[in-house]
């Protein structure tokens, strides 16, 4: 569909209004008069905010983009990265053909990259897959995917691995950012994802940020919070962090605490609520139940590590029946005096924060991102903030609630909702539940027993298995884990380069990961393919393909579906399975999984006239619609309802559950959520008893703390101008010039004590590796004494040479925020 910007906006204005009101109306296919630039709607490629954009194309290239003024999320605004979206696609080193390490025309793990055909690449891959399966079984092959993949790419990966290969070794890079949040949602409410939405911002009286620099990481949402704060003098903003950053500029209360003591701070708040009779007993008695967590649960390190000795690591996720009295006893030791000493916050700061949550007249929204999630007790801190909101009843109502912000455009839609984790299936189903496996097998038309009950390997376990030779093939898609993941030198790189292992990286650019792989597959980007993302407020948004990918680059979806043709059921399935469905004998996995009468049932005629759609044209049917409608069957009628496919192309996103054409803004609350019956008031229907869990857990120390040799805390993160590993943003000249290289931020007195000055070339070292960088004592980030901060966007400075691969033992998410380092002047 080619529209001028004016006609596009006119055609969608009524739809935007109708969608906001929960209505649906038909939209005609308006074809604009010839215009130099043709416009269509899209979704920003960066963070999890889900900003809508208008994409302008000319002569087969994206030449312009702007914020969509009719979009509810961003209201016409973009951040600095969003304004340069077109340029992410046109870096000079864009990959356009498959590249395989070769010597004399044959694969050689130590050879140089040489161009090959797609067929040669896939035949080589298939050979390596089959060798690995034969050597080490179904779990010898792994997929590390992405919260940047489109919804149907994530769904196809899940289906190929869990149904086709009968292996649950699929993990997304959301493991590094959202796993703790997802696990805590499931443990607390029996369902994943936030109950509120961005509309809370305009109705809240107070905002509390826990480990979240929204000013730089979610700037569009921060602009809405800023507007709310400036236009309402009684609104308050509190920011808690281990160092000062740009979000402190708006804060009424800026609190810098000692790393890991957020656990103690929240237990103090709970103690304050109890001691000051600030518990909403009516809410608590009707809608909650009490549990206590297993303690001394270890740090997700290798079993032989000293920190794993004599721990309850094997039962880390267990929750025991408990009571309010037991919670009261546990938190009683977290007095204001003790927590002040532990955290470094003064008593007034702590009491002011506790009073904010305790005040029944104040609507409070708590936001957090990686400061909570990338934490060796990330699940606990997530559940502790839920405790506070549940104990006060400040949840599931406009302007009140706990809200986990995502960092990737579809960490929710693709990683979590699709179930791209090694223990999950779509719509919060899990592989360990036989009834859930039966649902998947029914929808996917598979023999009973096809989906394995064995939980696959998470990414840190994949790294270790590759290093140990127990997993032999890894396919990495749409991420740069060799730069983004922890402990590069000791685990990941040795495993990737180990003789006998084979690594495939699908990427549009020659990243650190790609250059460490054996085979590089060139991928289509952003609007070079039809796509869908799910943002942090449960909003599912679609866009159409608007330009073609360069050269031989293909979408990840095409790669997955085409690769499925290189395997047959006879090779991958047991005789017991084939005997149940003999009609599947000899068929390719492509035929069984994708050309199955469901995915392929929508003809090409359902595409908009003149609409690009390379995958559908290649396979001969409307691939995306078929995949989506099959996927949506998992959640409809179960609180995860998605609208019909065609609705999303007409709207600017819809927040699930979408029931009878109406989206849901606040879940679990009568009058807002169609799954809450009249008279229930609140129903946390993820659990059969419709009650949420309040969990009693203590403070436990981090895996590594500063000592005499490594005397500083290291925290890693991002800056406004760059996104993750900089694969896209460093190829935008304007963004690169604005922030060309990584820095290490340090307190001026810490620098002085080491004989260092602002701008010095330094060496920062940990027990795992080192990095050469430059010192900043005057910039936007202002660490307290004893802590340094750095970023990971710079491929020339691999910050994750330093980080420890300690994880939360429950969520398996890495703690990138706390390890011990030393800093000295570089030679």
From Swiss-Prot:
Cofactor(s) named in the record: [4Fe-4S] cluster; Mo-bis(molybdopterin guanine dinucleotide)
Keywords attached to this entry: 4Fe-4S, Electron transport, Iron, Iron-sulfur, Metal-binding, Molybdenum, Nitrate assimilation, Oxidoreductase, Periplasm, Signal, Transport
A Gene Ontology molecular function term of the record: molybdenum ion binding
Cross-referenced Gene3D superfamilies: 2.40.40.20, 3.30.200.210, 3.40.50.740, Dimethylsulfoxide Reductase, domain 2
InterPro entries: Asp_de-COase-like_dom_sf (IPR009010), CT_Nitrate-R-NapA-like (IPR041957), MoPterin_dinucl-bd_dom (IPR006657), Mopterin_OxRdtase (IPR006656), Mopterin_OxRdtase_4Fe-4S_dom (IPR006963), Periplasm_NO3_reductase_lsu (IPR010051), Prok_molybdopt-oxidoreductase (IPR050123), TAT_signal (IPR006311)
Cellular-component GO terms for this entry: membrane; nitrate reductase complex; periplasmic space
PROSITE patterns: 4FE4S_MOW_BIS_MGD, TAT
Co-factor binding details: Binds 1 [4Fe-4S] cluster.
CDD domains: MopB_CT_Nitrate-R-NapA-like, MopB_Nitrate-R-NapA-like
Chain sites annotated for binding [4Fe-4S] cluster: 44, 47, 51, 79
Catalytic activity: 2 Fe(II)-[cytochrome] + nitrate + 2 H(+) = 2 Fe(III)-[cytochrome] + nitrite + H2O
Residue sites binding substrate per the record: 792
Residues binding Mo-bis(molybdopterin guanine dinucleotide), per UniProt: 81, 148, 173, 177, 210-217, 241-245, 260-262, 370, 374, 480, 506-507, 529, 556, 716-725, 800, 817
Compartments where located: Periplasm
UniProt signal peptide: 1-33
EC number(s) per entry: 1.9.6.1
HAMAP family found in the cross-reference section: Nitrate_reduct_NapA
Function (record text): Catalytic subunit of the periplasmic nitrate reductase complex NapAB. Receives electrons from NapB and catalyzes the reduction of nitrate to nitrite.
Subunit annotation: Component of the periplasmic nitrate reductase NapAB complex composed of NapA and NapB.
Protein name: Periplasmic nitrate reductase
Native source organism of the sequence: Haemophilus influenzae (strain PittEE)
Gene that this sequence comes from: napA
């Amino acid at each position: 569909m080619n529209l001028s910007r004016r006609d596009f906006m006119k055609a969608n204005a009524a739809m935007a209004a109708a969608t906001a009101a929960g209505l649906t109306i038909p939209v005609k296919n308006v074809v604009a008069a010839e215009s130099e630039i043709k416009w269509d709607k899209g979704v920003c490629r960066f963070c999890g905010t889900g900003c809508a954009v208008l994409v302008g194309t000319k002569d087969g290239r994206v030449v312009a983009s702007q914020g969509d003024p009719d979009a509810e999320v961003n209201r016409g605004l973009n951040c600095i990265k969003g304004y340069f979206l077109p340029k992410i696609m046109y870096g000079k080193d864009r990959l356009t053909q498959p590249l395989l390490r070769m010597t004399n025309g044959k694969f050689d793990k130590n050879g140089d990259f040489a161009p090959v055909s797609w067929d040669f690449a896939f035949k080589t891959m298939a050979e390596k897959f089959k060798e690995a399966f034969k050597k080490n079984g179904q779990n010898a092959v792994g997929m590390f995917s992405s919260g940047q993949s489109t919804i149907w790419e994530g769904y196809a990966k899940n289906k190929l691995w869990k149904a086709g290969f009968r292996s649950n070794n699929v993990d997304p890079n959301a493991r590094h950012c959202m796993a703790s949040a997802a696990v805590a949602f499931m443990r607390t409410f029996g369902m994943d994802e936030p109950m509120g939405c961005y509309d809370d911002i305009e109705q809240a009286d107070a905002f509390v940020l826990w480990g979240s620099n929204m000013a730089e990481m979610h700037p569009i949402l921060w602009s809405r919070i800023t507007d709310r704060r400036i236009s309402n003098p009684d609104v308050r903003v509190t920011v808690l962090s281990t160092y000062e950053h740009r979000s402190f500029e708006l804060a009424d209360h800026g609190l810098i605490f000692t790393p890991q003591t957020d656990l103690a701070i929240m237990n103090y708040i709970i103690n304050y609520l109890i001691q000051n009779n600030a518990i909403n007993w009516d809410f608590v008695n009707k809608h909650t139940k009490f549990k206590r967590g297993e303690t001394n649960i270890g740090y997700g390190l290798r079993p032989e590590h000293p920190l794993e000795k004599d721990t309850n690591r094997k039962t880390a996720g267990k929750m025991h029946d408990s009571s309010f009295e037991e919670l009261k006893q546990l938190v009683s030791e977290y007095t204001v005096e003790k927590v002040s000493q532990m955290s470094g916050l003064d008593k007034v700061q702590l009491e002011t924060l506790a009073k904010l949550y305790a005040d029944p007249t104040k609507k409070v929204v708590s936001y957090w991102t990686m400061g909570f999630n990338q934490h060796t007790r990330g699940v606990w801190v997530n559940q502790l903030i839920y405790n506070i909101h549940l104990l006060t009843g400040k949840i599931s109502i406009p302007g009140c609630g706990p809200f986990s912000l995502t960092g990737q455009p579809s960490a929710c839609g693709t990683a979590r909702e699709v179930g791209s984790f090694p223990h999950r299936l779509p719509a919060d189903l899990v592989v360990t539940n036989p009834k859930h496996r039966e649902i998947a097998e029914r929808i996917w038309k598979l023999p009973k027993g096809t989906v394995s009950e064995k939980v696959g390997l998470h990414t840190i376990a994949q790294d270790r298995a590759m290093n140990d030779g127990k997993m032999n093939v890894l396919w990495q898609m749409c991420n740069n884990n060799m730069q983004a993941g922890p402990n590069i030198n000791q685990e990941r790189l040795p495993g990737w380069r180990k003789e006998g292992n084979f690594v495939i990286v699908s990427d549009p650019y020659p990243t650190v990961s790609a250059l460490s792989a054996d085979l590089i597959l060139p991928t289509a980007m952003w609007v070079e393919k039809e796509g869908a993302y799910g943002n942090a407020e449960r909003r599912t948004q679609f866009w159409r393909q608007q330009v073609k990918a360069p050269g031989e680059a293909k979408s990840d979806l095409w790669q997955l579906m085409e690769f499925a043709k290189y395997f047959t059921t006879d090779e991958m399935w047991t005789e017991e399975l084939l005997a149940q469905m003999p009609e599947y004998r000899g068929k390719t996995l492509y035929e069984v999984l994708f050309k199955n009468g469901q995915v392929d049932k929508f003809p090409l005629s359902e595409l908009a006239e003149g609409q690009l759609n390379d995958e559908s044209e290649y396979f001969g049917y409307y691939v995306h619609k078929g995949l989506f409608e099959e996927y949506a069957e998992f959640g409809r009628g179960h609180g995860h309802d998605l609208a019909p496919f065609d609705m999303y192309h007409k709207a600017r996103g819809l927040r699930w559950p979408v029931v009878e054409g109406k989206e849901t803004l606040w879940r679990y609350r009568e009058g807002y959520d169609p799954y809450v019956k009249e008279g229930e008031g609140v129903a946390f229907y993820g659990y059969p008893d419709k009650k949420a869990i309040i969990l009693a857990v203590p403070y436990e120390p981090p895996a590594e703390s500063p000592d005499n040799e490594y005397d500083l805390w290291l925290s890693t993160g991002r800056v406004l101008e760059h996104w993750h590993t900089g694969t896209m943003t460093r190829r935008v000249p304007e963004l690169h010039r604005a922030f060309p290289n990584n820095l290490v931020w340090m307190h001026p007195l810490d620098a002085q004590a080491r004989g260092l000055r602002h701008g010095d070339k330094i060496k920062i070292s940990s027990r795992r590796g080192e990095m050469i960088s430059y010192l900043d004592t005057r910039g936007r980030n202002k660490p307290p004494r004893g802590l340094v901060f750095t970023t990971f966007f710079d491929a020339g400075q691999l910050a994750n040479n330093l980080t420890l691969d300690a994880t939360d033992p429950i969520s398996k998410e890495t703690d990138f925020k706390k390890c011990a380092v030393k800093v000295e002047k570089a030679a």
